[in-house]
Structure formats: C-alpha cells, structure tokens
Amino acid sequence: MKGKTCFYDVEALDGDIRICLKGEMDHHNAVGVRGEIDKLIYDERPKRLMLDLSEIGFMDSSGLGFIMGRYALMEKLGGTLILENPNERIVKIFELAGLQRIVRVENSKKEKTK
C-alpha cells in the first residue's frame, strides 16, 4: 500500500497486526497513511499493533504525532502499540520527545526497551 513517499506492508499475526513502514514519515505522508491504518485498526481490532520502523529513513514531528495517535487509538480499543526496529536517528528523536517512556520500543537486533 502507498502514501506519497511512505509505503507500508501489512502482516496479520494471530490477532496481532505488524505494519512495516517504508520511506519518509513527514506531514504529507502521515496524513495519507493515518486514515488507512486507522481503518485497518477499527476493522481488525488487533490485540497488538506492531509498527516496524526499520525502513523509515526520515521522521519529523508529524511522524511522532502519527505514532501517538495510533498509541491513543490502540489504548482506547484495549490494545497495545509496539514500535519495532527504529534506526539510531529515530531513537534519538524518541528520546528527545520522551516517547520511550510512553510507548514500548523493541529492537530485534538489540535489547528490548520500554
């Protein structure tokens, strides 16, 4: 599936959903992807939504807003959001924003953090 320069693949996993985001997560892309993913969440009601960020090369404050919006939606529906495999630049953005204190972040190549 495709936003402007942000693409994503969806994988259903026994009541969970993993979405692999690819490209850039900025204002223009977050708007398009947001509606599609929210519809998927409402339709499927996953226990866990895992956003794989390993292929995101750029993220700005709109990307953080996108993540926090999905966090709030999953909390509202009784589910959990997990961010997977962010690169070092994205981790730095999360640290500066304090996001890792709120949303679970896991890296399959390193230790899991929360």
Residue spans of the language-model regions?
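STAS-like cytosolic regulatory interaction modules
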Residues: 1-55, 72-114
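Short, solvent-exposed loop/turn at the beta-strand->alpha-helix junction
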Residues: 57-59
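Histidine-anchored nucleotide/phosphate-binding helix
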Residues: 67-71
